[in-house]
């Protein structure tokens, strides 16, 4: 038995979707798993025959009895994911579907794809999902895979050093201001440091910082402040279902976080004292203004006691091994 994992390539260097799949694959390779590389492209440039041959090339190394961890979506359209699943099902193998995002739930305009999405999910032997709430939601739409694993949180494997963190009354937020409208509406006297490529007009107290390589970003953030995990109101329901990659990044940097009430990881954050759960931005601003040095240092201590499991990839190691056990064992 050999274990394989799909992995997308060819997207922008800034693509969080690609970064997440690449990170999981790096951990998987360290465990002895093998990569099935998938290039991101416009699939309709292929004829049916060409696409079938492309998929044959992806799965060419498989043997009967192997296990494949299928990271989904591939972002090559739902049609591509369906066809890849169908190709995998031709083999006498076990299939673990690792759901990063559910496209019909992310974007209301894509909800029409839900039935097709659930149909190919149901061909898996095991489903790994970001949260139990996501699993429950998918069951409401007809998912019937009995074996499931909860991811819980994104790791952020790194060896970047952490500087001593002092109380800085500032908030860090990597993200596109065009996607997160609250950035362009920031009217508070606490500065918001936005890490982005985009050149857009921003409020006076929003400080645009150009793209940073990962280790540089973590080291800069490690010097203090708070990491903000936030979405616009229209996306709050989805935030209660999925795992935010930003959360793992902030914690790996060694700084406390501020997150919206209802986030999928809320219990983990509360139980480990990793930051604050707030109802709105105004409450977040009030807390940043009122926190004292001792309280901040205690939060940092909690985060840095917790973050070795993220920096060494243990959430990912756990789901990769647990899902294989579930696939093989009844």
From Swiss-Prot:
Cofactor binding mode and count: In vitro glycosyltransferase activity is metal-independent.
Family: Belongs to the Gtf3 glucosyltransferase family.
InterPro entries in UniProt: Gtf3 (IPR043676)
A biological process term (GO) from this entry: protein glycosylation
Effect of mutating residue 246 to A: Complete loss of glycosyltransferase activity, the protein forms tetramers, does not restore Fap1 glycosylation in vivo
Disruption phenotype: The Fap1 protein no longer reacts with a glycan-specific antibody, and migrates as a much larger than wild-type protein. Fap1 is not able to undergo the second glycosylation step. Has defects in biofilm mass accumulation, the biofilm that forms is not as thick as wild-type. Deletion of this gene can be complemented by the ortholog from S.agalactiae strain COH1, but not from S.pneumoniae strain TIGR4 or from S.sanguinis strain SK36.
Protein name: Glucosyltransferase 3
Outcome (variant: residue 179 to A): Complete loss of glycosyltransferase activity, does not restore Fap1 glycosylation in vivo
Chain positions recorded as UDP binding sites: 16, 179, 211-214, 244-249
The keyword Nucleotide-binding belongs to this UniProt entry's keyword annotation: yes
Gene of this entry: gtf3
Keyword set, alphabetical order: Glycosyltransferase, Nucleotide-binding, Transferase
Stretches the record annotates as Substrate protein-binding loop: 106-111
Presence of the UniProt keyword Protease in the record: no
Domain of life: Bacteria
Consequence of changing residue 315 to A: Complete loss of glycosyltransferase activity, the protein does not dimerize
Comment block on domains: Dimerizes via the C-terminus; dimerization is required for tetramer formation. Binds protein substrate via an exposed loop in the N-terminus.
Top-level enzyme category: transferase
A GO term for molecular function: nucleotide binding
EC number, UniProt record: 2.4.1.-
Source organism (scientific name): Streptococcus parasanguinis
Pathway the protein contributes to: Protein modification; protein glycosylation
Subunit (UniProt): Homotetramer; a dimer of dimers.
UniProt function note: Required for polymorphic O-glycosylation of the serine-rich repeat protein Fap1. Catalyzes the second step in glycosylation of the serine-rich repeat protein in this bacteria. Transfers glucose from UDP-glucose to the terminal GlcNAc moiety of 3-O-(N-acetyl-alpha-D-glucosaminyl)-L-seryl-[protein] which results from the first glycosylation step of Fap1; does not use other sugar nucleotides as substrates.
């Amino acid at each position: 038995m050999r274990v394989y994992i799909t992995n997308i390539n060819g997207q922008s260097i800034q693509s969080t979707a690609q970064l997440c799949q690449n990170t999981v694959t790096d951990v998987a390779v360290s465990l002895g798993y093998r990569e099935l590389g998938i290039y991101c492209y416009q699939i309709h440039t292929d004829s049916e025959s060409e696409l079938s041959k492309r998929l044959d090339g992806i799965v060419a190394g498989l043997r009967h009895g192997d296990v494949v961890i299928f990271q989904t979506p591939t972002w090559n359209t739902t049609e591509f994911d369906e066809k890849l699943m169908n190709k995998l099902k031709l083999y006498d193998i076990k299939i673990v579907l690792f759901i990063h995002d559910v496209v019909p739930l992310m974007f209301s305009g894509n909800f029409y794809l839900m039935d097709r999405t659930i149909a190919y999910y149901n061909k898996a032997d095991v489903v790994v999902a970001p949260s139990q709430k996501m699993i429950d939601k998918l069951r409401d739409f007809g998912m019937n895979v009995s074996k499931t694993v909860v991811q819980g949180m994104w790791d952020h494997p790194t060896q970047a050093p952490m500087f001593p963190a002092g109380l800085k009354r500032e908030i860090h937020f990597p993200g596109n201001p065009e996607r997160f409208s609250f950035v362009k509406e920031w009217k508070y006297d606490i500065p918001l440091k936005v890490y982005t490529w985009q050149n857009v007009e921003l409020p006076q107290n929003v400080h645009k910082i150009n793209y940073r390589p990962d280790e540089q970003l973590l080291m800069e953030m490690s010097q203090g402040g708070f990491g903000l995990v936030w979405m616009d109101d229209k996306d709050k329901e989805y935030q209660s279902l999925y795992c935010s990659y930003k959360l793992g990044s902030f914690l790996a940097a060694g700084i406390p976080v501020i997150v919206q009430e209802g986030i999928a990881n809320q219990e983990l954050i509360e139980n480990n004292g990793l930051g604050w759960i707030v109802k709105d931005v105004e409450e977040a601003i009030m807390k940043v203004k009122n926190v004292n040095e001792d309280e901040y240092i205690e939060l940092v201590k909690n985060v840095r006691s917790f973050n070795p499991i993220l920096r060494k990839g243990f959430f990912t190691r756990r789901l990769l091994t647990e899902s294989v056990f579930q696939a093989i064992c009844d």
